[in-house]
Amino acid sequence: MFNIASAPFAHNRKQTQTLMLLVILACLPGFLAQSWFFGWGTLIQILLALVTALGSEALVLRLRGRPVKPALLDGSAALTAVLIGLSLPPLLPWWMLVLGTAFAIIIAKHLYGGLGQNLFNPAMVAYVLLLVSFPVQMTSWLPPSSIAAYDIGFGDAASVIFTGFSLDGYSMAQLKQGVDGLTMATPLDTLKTGLTQGLTAGEVMTHTVFEGWGGIGWSWVNLGYLLGGLFLLQQKVINWRIPGAILGSLLLAATLGYLMTPDATATPMFHLFSGATMLGAFFIATDPVSASTTPRGRLVYGVLIGVLVYVIRRFGGYPDAFAFAVLLANLCVPLIDSLTRPKVYGARRK
């Protein structure tokens, strides 16, 4: 006897909660590398973002008359909080993180209808809101621990986040200094600043912060997220097309740029292993709600992000570009899906 049932006939055994937990678990290698090189601030930011995201989610659901507990347990708000905490500078003032996280949940997610309805990636909406509103604080990263002038423990990190000063009274401006007395910035920011001052890329990359493929600490952070991304691919949580297209197009664009203008462009490997490249390619751009859903569309979507990342890094006003690239690509998803929709078997071409 055959059972008669309605579609769908193929099912994914992984529920939403399981998928979200797997993605959070895959963030662990990158998070550990980030914490090793940049201190306890990232952990504090993630915890604060979790409290804010879950509280905002519960508040909006209560106002909308929707069940609160199932939505809090599905893991979507928690994942958004984790991605926000990982994306922001470790010692960003607490109220900025709360503002960005609440905006991500209330506006970027629930204004469009809630889970599965948002047009834009909520974590990246929060990031861009804060970057445009508070550019100085959003580009204030600590130097890697190996070249930092001050040792920042958990208490110091918490004190700076909530009061603006360490336990010893040092300000954020002082804590940003390296052992050579120079104020540190991310490798991408240092490169952008040096090029605007008329230096060549080779001259800029003699700076202390440049070491390895993507700069001190950043190479390991990106390797950590690459490892987590490969885990997601192995678990079939994400599709290979989006990260593959992003990394491939970014590598190709960076290679062409480096061959044509080597004095004004960093090496292709630098673009792959600096900034938010691996976090963006495997964890942010692959958001199943705001990303393209067709096989060819995912390739187009990924290529668009990769090219935009390089163009904005090279010619734009912001050192890293993943948030802008992802949001611009999100905007194009309806058109991409419409143009790349698979042909129905047996249908005639018009």
Swiss-Prot record:
The keyword rRNA-binding is assigned to this record: no
InterPro entries: NqrB/RnfD, RnfD_bac
An individual GO BP term: electron transport chain
Signal sequence annotation: none
Modified residues (FMN phosphoryl threonine): 186
Cofactor section: FMN
E.C. number(s) listed in UniProt: 7.-.-.-
A cellular component annotation (GO) from this entry: plasma membrane
Compartments, record wording: Cell inner membrane
Key words of the record: Cell inner membrane, Cell membrane, Electron transport, Flavoprotein, FMN, Membrane, Phosphoprotein, Translocase, Transmembrane, Transmembrane helix, Transport
Membrane-crossing segments per the record: 19-39, 41-61, 67-87, 88-108, 122-142, 213-233, 242-262, 264-284, 299-316
Broad class of where this protein is predominantly found: membrane
A Pfam family hit: NQR2_RnfD_RnfE
Membrane topology: Multi-pass membrane protein
Family: Belongs to the NqrB/RnfD family.
UniProt cross-references to HAMAP family, sorted A to Z: RsxD_RnfD
Record text on subunit structure and interactions: The complex is composed of six subunits: RnfA, RnfB, RnfC, RnfD, RnfE and RnfG.
Function, as annotated: Part of a membrane-bound complex that couples electron transfer with translocation of ions across the membrane.
The name this protein goes by in its record: Ion-translocating oxidoreductase complex subunit D
Record organism: Aeromonas hydrophila subsp. hydrophila (strain ATCC 7966 / DSM 30187 / BCRC 13018 / CCUG 14551 / JCM 1027 / KCTC 2358 / NCIMB 9240 / NCTC 8049)
